[in-house]
Design a protein with these regions (language model features):
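A short, basic N-terminal segment
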Residues: 6, 18, 23-87
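Mid-core helix/loop region of P-loop NTP-binding domains shared across ATPases and GTPases
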Residues: 32-48, 88, 123-125, 133-253, ...
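Walker A/P-loop nucleotide-binding motif
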Residues: 87-107
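Post-Walker A helix-loop "phosphate-sensing" segment adjacent to the P-loop in P-loop NTPases
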Residues: 111-121, 152
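Conserved C-terminal helix/linker of AAA+ ATPases
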Residues: 300-321
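Short alpha-helical segments that sit at the start of domains
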Residues: 322-352
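Terminal-proximal interaction/regulatory segments of ATP-powered molecular machines
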Residues: 351-430
Length: 430
């Protein structure tokens, strides 16, 4: 690869010449201080459009949740029996990313229900696990649950069943209702199967003091359709769908946060509307809308302006798309990167439909070139489903008559860029 030499002056800091050996290390600069403390002093003297930026973060707990009154009520109805020490029904919540699922569950369970239980003198325990971040295996799940109820485990020597038993033994030590919230439960099921659900429901029947209810949160609307019949039977779960927000609802959410996040008159007309329109276009994602508004404000601060303009929203969208896709591409397993590289080379850009069979044939050729054993076509199909969920591709199943069904795939515009191609080629050494 050709080495690039760059030199920039940024606010008194000399960024010296450096070779760009690869995309992965091109962000590592050799810095020479001119007057580094002065840079930060000047930064602190500069104004900001923000009053309280953390209000725009996805993990912020607001005072109100607009346009989710129906869903809040339905969750309340399901969990209310816990206040009488009666086991609530298991509940599976579905909806695309950024539709308020986790926020509503935490609002009702960790907020309202726990407060009501304290007033009533009732013992309700709540455990929250993000299955994608904290427990993507059955062993990891029960270890995390055991840790949260205060059970100390040895570092080695325990099987999954041992850890499961240790967790339930500790949880059953007091008379209470235990509500286990499993966020991104579909991610754990894809990696570990659904046996953990069966274990929880069967163990529940053996407990003497504690009764356990499961609340599963999923971005995949169809994941429960693949549950084993015995698991479905033991769960007897209720279901709740969170629909995407529309542009008007997203504007209300943004205005609700912006009044606390930004200084007076620091948002120009049309900024909130533009953020809402962009996010509504992408399945009504409130998290995306909040990120757009936050990044637009950050870009405004960096250029020293006093108000966020509509053009800053366009710049924010471009930055977020680039950063998100780059992270997704570089953190994928090698086999998944080969699948994506195959899609990229067949598609020749966004806007063209291709088929699973085409992708698989080219993928096998790249595996041979990389000295890797190819995955089965079914596993590659699972990877395509993950790409679809991540927004890297859009996919739909179509019928080809007597030839059966196949999947029609289109590469998302933000993934069909020279940067993505370069990242993949460097990661795969192609």
């Amino acid at each position: 690869m050709v080495c690039l030499e760059c030199i920039f002056y940024l606010s008194g800091i000399l960024i010296k010449r450096f070779p760009c050996f690869s995309i992965r290390n091109s962000g590592v600069f050799i810095l020479k201080e001119k007057n580094l403390p002065q840079f930060f002093e000047e930064y602190l003297k500069k104004g900001s459009v923000f009053k309280e930026k953390r209000v725009l973060q996805a993990n912020h707990f607001p005072n109100d949740i607009p346009h989710r009154a129906v869903q809040i009520h339905q969750v309340r109805v399901v969990v209310a029996p816990a206040l009488r020490l009666e086991r609530p029904s298991n509940l599976f919540i579905y909806g695309k990313t950024g539709t308020g699922k986790t926020l509503v569950v935490k609002w009702v369970i960790n907020g309202e229900l726990v407060s009501a239980a304290k007033k009533a003198g009732v013992s309700i325990q709540t455990l929250y696990v993000n299955c994608k971040l904290d427990a993507d295996t059955e062993y990891g799940l029960f270890t995390e649950l055991a840790t949260q109820v205060g059970k100390e485990l040895p570092l080695t020597g325990l099987s999954t069943d041992d850890v499961c038993s240790a967790f339930f033994s500790k949880a059953d030590s007091t008379k209470s209702i235990l509500i286990i919230i499993l966020d991104e439960i579909d991610y754990l099921m894809k990696k570990a199967g659904d046996d953990f659900l069966y274990k929880i429901t069967r163990k529940n029947e053996e407990l003497k003091n504690t009764q356990v209810a499961i609340i599963g949160i999923s971005n995949d609307l169809m994941f429960a359709e693949h549950l084993d019949p015995r698991v479905k039977s033991s769960l007897s779960e209720e279901k709740l769908l969170f629909p995407p927000y529309n542009a008007i609802e997203l504007q209300d959410i943004l205005n609700n946060r912006a009044s606390s996040a930004f200084k007076h008159s620091s948002l120009e007309p049309g900024v909130v509307e533009k953020c809402a329109a962009y996010a509504a276009r992408e399945h009504g994602d409130a998290r995306r809308a909040l990120d757009l508004l936050r990044v637009a404000g950050e870009l405004t601060d960096r250029k020293g302006a006093t108000s966020v303009a509509v053009a800053d929203v366009d710049s924010a969208e471009e930055k977020i798309d680039h950063d998100t896709v780059a992270e997704l591409v570089t953190t994928q397993p090698r086999q998944a990167q080969l699948v994506l590289y195959s899609i990229l080379n067949i598609s020749h850009g966004a806007g063209k439909f291709i088929f699973t069979g085409e992708v698989y044939e080219l993928y096998k050729k790249y595996c041979a070139k990389a000295s890797l054993r190819p995955l089965t076509q079914r596993r590659v199909s699972d990877i395509l489903s993950e790409f679809d969920m991540l927004g890297i591709i859009t996919a739909r199943v179509i019928s080809k008559g007597r030839y059966g069904r196949t999947r029609e795939i289109m590469l998302a515009p933000q993934a069909a860029t020279p940067v993505v191609r370069r990242l993949l080629e460097e990661a795969l050494n192609l």
